[in-house]
């Protein structure tokens, strides 16, 4: 089963859920998760919780405990908040390059699924008739303690956008498309290094080439140790083939570390 995760405390999440039910034929079942109705269509279920999803470590175990199945993948339908209030449609994997400020554990990562995130980016970009930004975000916040692949897909960045009907429709359609197609998609998988939080160069590369990013280490989280980068590389569902560096958007020691790791691991080194 493929899981679409939502929460009652998030207006964007509820907007996306409503559009999934209205437009894509999800039907209420007799099952409950965290006390809320479970909706199902084919091999997909919508689950709803009552608190912020970023703190839901071990969600996969909880699903197994309550519903007796292990998810193949979890798509978290969520809001994105930023001070700039940039209208945006974003996707990213979760985890913490350093201290865990917002869920998850320190220096710990969820399992990235680059093919799903790339398909999400491409589909959001294709459907985006709002004129909003479509982008990756760097790896940040929780949950980090999940043993199945997952990704967040978000509407940003203020209440006005969270409740926007068209944004809800775009994300709902994107999620269904991604869950239907990610298993049959083959891209060149890369760890991304450098740039700001919205990973502009990685986003551009993913939209215009066969590169698909999983974990992305932004400049503001640098430097990190070799061990932390290796930890992130080991938390990809698909085999990492390249390390990509936004050269100007990275600190000197991180550039060199990325270069030597690529050599050591036999990965392609892409300098942009």
Curated annotation (Swiss-Prot):
Keywords: Hydrolase, Metal-binding, Zinc. Its cofactor is Zn(2+). Changing residue 92 to A: Reduces deacylase activity. It is an enzyme of class 3 (hydrolase). Pfam families: tRNA_deacylase. Its EC number is 3.1.1.96. Thermostable. GO terms for biological process: D-amino acid catabolic process. It catalyses: a D-aminoacyl-tRNA + H2O = a tRNA + a D-alpha-amino acid + H(+); glycyl-tRNA(Ala) + H2O = tRNA(Ala) + glycine + H(+); D-tyrosyl-tRNA(Tyr) + H2O = D-tyrosine + tRNA(Tyr). The keyword Zinc applies. GO terms for molecular function: D-tyrosyl-tRNA(Tyr) deacylase activity; zinc ion binding. Binds 2 Zn(2+) ions per subunit. Belongs to the DtdA deacylase family. D-aminoacyl-tRNA deacylase with broad substrate specificity. By recycling D-aminoacyl-tRNA to D-amino acids and free tRNA molecules, this enzyme counteracts the toxicity associated with the formation of D-aminoacyl-tRNA entities in vivo. Catalyzes the hydrolysis of D-tyrosyl-tRNA(Tyr) and D-aspartyl-tRNA(Asp). Monomer. NCBIfam families: PRK03995.1-6. This is D-aminoacyl-tRNA deacylase. The gene is dtdA.
């Amino acid at each position: 089963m493929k899981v679409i995760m939502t929460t009652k405390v998030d207006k964007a999440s509820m907007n996306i859920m409503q559009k999934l039910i209205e437009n894509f034929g999800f039907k209420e079942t007799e099952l409950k998760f965290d006390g809320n109705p479970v909706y199902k269509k084919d091999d997909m279920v919508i689950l709803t919780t009552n608190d912020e999803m970023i703190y839901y470590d071990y969600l996969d175990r909880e699903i197994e405990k309550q519903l007796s199945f292990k998810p193949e993948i979890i798509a978290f339908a969520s809001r994105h908040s930023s001070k700039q209030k940039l209208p945006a449609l974003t996707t990213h994997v979760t985890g913490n390059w350093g201290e865990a400020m917002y869920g998850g554990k320190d220096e710990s990562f969820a399992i990235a699924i680059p093919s799903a995130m790339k398909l999400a980016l491409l589909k959001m970009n294709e459907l985006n008739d709002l004129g909003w930004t479509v982008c990756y975000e760097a790896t940040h916040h929780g949950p980090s303690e999940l043993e199945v692949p997952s990704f967040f897909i978000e509407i940003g960045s203020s209440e006005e956008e969270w409740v926007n009907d068209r944004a809800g429709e775009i994300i709902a359609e994107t999620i269904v498309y991604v869950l239907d197609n990610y298993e049959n998609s083959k891209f060149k998988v890369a760890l991304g290094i450098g740039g700001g939080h919205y990973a502009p160069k990685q986003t551009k590369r993913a939209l215009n080439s066969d590169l698909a990013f999983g974990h992305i280490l932004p400049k503001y989280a640098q430097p990190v140790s070799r061990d932390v980068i290796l930890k992130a590389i080991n938390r990809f569902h698909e085999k990492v083939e390249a390390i990509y560096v936004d050269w100007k958007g990275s600190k000197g020691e991180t550039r060199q570390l990325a270069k030597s790791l690529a050599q050591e691991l036999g990965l392609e080194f892409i300098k942009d």
